[in-house]
Amino acid sequence: MAFRRRTKSYPLFSQEFIIHNHADIGFCLVLCVLIGLMFEVTAKTAFLFILPQYNISVPTADSETVHYHYGPKDLVTILFYVVITIIFHAVVQEYILDKISKRLHLSKVKHSKFNESGQLLVFHLSAVAWCFYVIVTEGYLTNPRSLWEDYPHVYLSFQVKFFYLGQLAYWLHSLPELYFQKVRKEEVPRQLQYICLYLLHITGAYLLNLSRLGLILLLLQYSTEALFHMARLFHFADENNERLFNAWAAVFGVTRLFILTLAVLTIGFGLARVENQVFDPEKGNFNTLPCRLGMLLLVCVAQAWLMWRFIHSQLRHWREYWKEQSAKRRVSAVPRPPAKLLKREPGYHENGVVKAENGTSSRTKKLKSP
C-alpha cells in the first residue's frame, strides 16, 4: 500500500511496482495539476480538472445566481477526483484498517472482507452526512413537491453537481481498486455487480435530470449500507454479536419500501401531472410515458433483485444456524457410558507392590511344608 516504507524494490513500471505505488503515482499527478494553477498559461487547463464546468448565471429578483449543467467536460473533472479518491483509499487502508486488522488476527478471506467493509463504511458515513447536508440546504425535505415540480431540473447548484461528480468518481475508482487490492477472482463478480448498479442509477439520475429524487434515494440506500458494513465489522471483532445484523435486516426491508414508494410517487404520479411532457433531449426533458415506464422498471427491477438476494442470504444463514443447533443437540443427547468403578485394595503402592497399612505386603504368604 502507498506511503509505507518498503524493503523490497520492484522493477520500474512493472505490475508489482504499479500495485504497490499506485497511490504515490496518483499523488504526483494531482501535484502536477495543482502546480499548473500557479502559471497563467496552464491555469485554465488546471481549473478544468478541479472545478465543475458549464456554469451559467441565472438572473433572480435580487441578483444573479450561478448554476451548472452537465456536459462532456465533466469526464475530465471526474477523472481528477478518481485519482484523489484512490489516494484517500490508500490512506484509510494503511493508517486505519491495517492497524485494526493486525490486532484481530483475521484469516485471509475475512481480512479481504474486513477491508472491503471498512472502506465502504467510511465512504457511506461521509456520503450520508454530505447528502443530508445538501438535501437540507436545498430545501427538498420541507418541500417534497420540488422533486417533480419545474421538471426538467437542468440547472444545478454547485453543491448538487459536485456531489454527483464525487459519487461517480468514487464508484469509478472502485474498478481499478479491484486490481490494486488483488481481490480474489471469486469476489470480483459480486463486487462488480453492486459497483455497476450504483454507476447506472447515479448516472441515470444525473443525465435524466432527476437529481433531486436521486439525492433522496441515495440517502436511504447509503444509510442502510452503512448499517450493514458496521454490523459486519463488529461481527469480525465478536462473532457472537448479531444485534446490528438484526437491526439491518429490519431496516433493509423498510428502505426498499420507501425507495419504491418515492419512485412511484415522483415518476409515476408527479411527473405525469407536469404540463411539459415532450421528449426533448436538447433541453433535458425526458418526461414521456415510455421514459417514465423505463425509469420505474429500472428502479423496481433493481429493488426486487436486492430483495431476492437478501431473502436468499437470510434463508441460507438460518439453515446454517439450525444445522449447528441440531448438531449441538445430537452431541448432548448421546448417552455417555457409565464409568467403571475400580476396586482398590487397602494400603498403598510401593515399587509396584501393594503394601498393607502396617507396612507388610498384602499378598498372602505361602506356608512352607514341614
From Swiss-Prot:
Transmembrane segments: 23-43, 76-96, 120-140, 160-180, 192-209, 215-235, 251-271, 288-308
InterPro entries assigned: TLC-dom (IPR006634), Translocation_assoc_membrane (IPR016447)
Residue span, TLC domain: 112-321
Gene Ontology terms describing biological process: collagen biosynthetic process; protein insertion into ER membrane; SRP-dependent cotranslational protein targeting to membrane, translocation
GO cellular component: membrane
Cytoplasmic membrane side: 1-22, 97-119, 181-191, 236-250, 309-370
Glycosylation sites: N55
Record's bilayer topology term: Multi-pass membrane protein
Domain of life: Eukaryota
Pfam families named in the record: TRAM_LAG1_CLN8 (PF03798)
Renumbered residue ranges of the record's region Disordered: 332-370
Compartments (UniProt record): Membrane
All ranges on the Extracellular side of the membrane: 44-75, 141-159, 210-214, 272-287
Chief location: membrane
Keywords: Glycoprotein, Membrane, Protein transport, Translocation, Transmembrane, Transmembrane helix, Transport
Protein function: Necessary for collagen type I synthesis. May couple the activity of the ER Ca(2+) pump SERCA2B with the activity of the translocon. This coupling may increase the local Ca(2+) concentration at the site of collagen synthesis, and a high Ca(2+) concentration may be necessary for the function of molecular chaperones involved in collagen folding. Required for proper insertion of the first transmembrane helix N-terminus of TM4SF20 into the ER lumen, may act as a ceramide sensor for regulated alternative translocation (RAT).
Similarity annotation: Belongs to the TRAM family.
Quaternary organization: Interacts with COL1A1. Interacts with SERCA2B.
This protein's name: Translocating chain-associated membrane protein 2
UniProt source species: Mus musculus
Taxonomic lineage of the native organism: Eukaryota, Metazoa, Chordata, Craniata, Vertebrata
Gene that this sequence comes from: Tram2
